[in-house]
Regions:
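Single, function-defining residue in the core of a domain
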Residues: 4-174
Length: 174
């Protein structure tokens, strides 16, 4: 999905062909995109937040905002640490988490800016729903290659994915 000037759209419908990987399909779509005239974002789930895809979209002028798996490697303070392990360490003090509201839902969020495997500098948001703060199963993480975005902006842009995800789910069922 692409976000440009406040509008979020599914850019292309491509029938899945098992002879071509989903990653290659996304690569081909990215290479066909026109260069955006304003700040634009590739919105994606955790399958597409890795170096190769991020770099292809960056070359076309798009930042990436997407989900991350909680076993993704970060480098806080220069030390390699799994995202979920880093979140557990942060819970000891709890002081670095801030309560934010996105579309009437409240979340405790920690903002990390730094290195990930294959990505020199990005923002990663570690997020817990307000009522599940500290529950390892409730931990969600989001990446933004646009480090200038606020926590609220990043989560608000990412939340724009859900209507289209619901559409895809209904298409798969039918």
């Amino acid at each position: 999905m692409l976000s440009c000037n406040g509008i979020v759209l599914n850019y292309a419908f491509v029938m899945y062909n098992k002879s071509i990987s989903k990653i290659n399909i996304v690569e081909n779509i990215a290479k066909e995109l026109p260069v955006p005239l304003v700040m634009s974002y590739f919105l994606c789930d955790c399958w597409y937040t890795f170096e190769k895809i991020i770099n292809i979209f960056a070359a076309r002028g798009f930042h990436t905002i997407g989900a991350l798996k909680t076993n993704r490697m970060l480098y806080p303070f220069g030390f390699k640490k799994k995202l979920n392990e880093f979140a557990s360490l942060l819970l000891i003090t709890r002081s670095n988490f801030h309560l934010v509201t996105v579309k009437k839902q409240k979340y405790y969020v920690y903002r990390y800016e730094g290195k990930l495997n294959g990505i020199e500098n990005a923002v990663v948001l570690l997020s817990y729903p307000e009522k599940a703060f500290g529950n390892p199963k409730a931990l969600r993480a989001f990446l933004s290659t646009d480090v200038a975005l606020s926590v609220d902006e990043t989560l608000s842009y990412y939340a724009c994915r859900w209507p289209i995800e619901i559409f895809f789910a209904s298409v798969r069922i039918n």
